[in-house]
Amino acid sequence: MTKMLGLRWTSTMAGALAATVIGSAATVIGTAETEAAECPRKDALGTSRVLSVDPKTYPRVGLKSFPQTLPLADREVVLTFDDGPHPPTTSKVLAALEQECVRATFFLIGQHASEHPDMVKRIAREGHTVGHHSFSHPFMGHIPFEKAIADVDRGIAADEMALHGTSTTTPSTPFFRFPYFESTQAELDLLQSRGIVVFGADLWASDWEEMTPEQQLKLVTERLAASGKGIILFHDNKARTAAMMPAFLRYLRENGYRVVHIVPTGTSQRNADTR
């Protein structure tokens, strides 16, 4: 069993952690891993390890959409959040993660990133991975290929501008999740040719449906107990998710689950050290 360690929430540590990950990038399974830094709160859930994802080996992951997923051990989870940033709720999700010294991945909508660049910088400054989720959240399987890719690129450019002050369609973190998990083969092939990992999910909380935080907690924990591990999808723009998150993290801690933080391989992971 991997020793569970937490994370110290400083940009200096984030930079050191990125250097450690990059230095470990060559492995036989296409990922690199390192233990996380020590957490000031000894009883926190923490982050057990960092997994560096190579797009050549893992171009598409998440069993809900693809035949392959990340190489996670039993009771290992990757926490991912879509559709932010939305300051009223994203800030509460970030606070819950910080309380437990947990790092996650946020797939941002470019329009929201443009509207809330300070929140984007906060996500990165607190050590989380920033991925991409289009600019306007369209149904990409129902629009022309050129229009879909333009929306992908516009979203990446908006996220990069919010993070680094530079508009570019070359993502500093080449992680993308299609809105509604809807894509065409041509879109998937193009992103693969650009070295961008496409993320699905292994399970989700269905937090787009109307339910109480308590109902959501019951639903996602039952699904996790059935699957035993996996990439979990939440939405940080949902008030019910923000309200449920402290209890969910406590459930993970009390039931022996371990959080894995995903980062890109072969990059400087600039978005983990944005001030």
Task: Place the predicted regions along the sequence by residue.
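Short helix-terminating capping/connector loops at secondary-structure junctions
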Residues: 166-172
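Catalytic grooves of carbohydrate-active enzymes
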Residues: 225-263
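Structural recognition of the beta-strand scaffold that forms the well-ordered cores
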Residues: 77-80, 104-108, 129-132, 174-178, ...
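N-terminal pre-catalytic segment of deacetylase/amide-hydrolase enzymes
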Residues: 2-80, 86-99, 215, 249-251, ...
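Alpha-helical scaffold elements lining the catalytic groove of polysaccharide deacetylases
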Residues: 89, 138-165, 182-228, 243-244
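Extracytoplasmic
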Residues: 72-76, 101, 125, 135, ...
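Acidic (Asp/Glu)-rich catalytic clusters
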Residues: 93-99, 113-131, 191-193, 223-225
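Solvent-exposed loop/turn segments at secondary-structure junctions
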Residues: 83-87, 111-114, 129-130, 136-140, ...
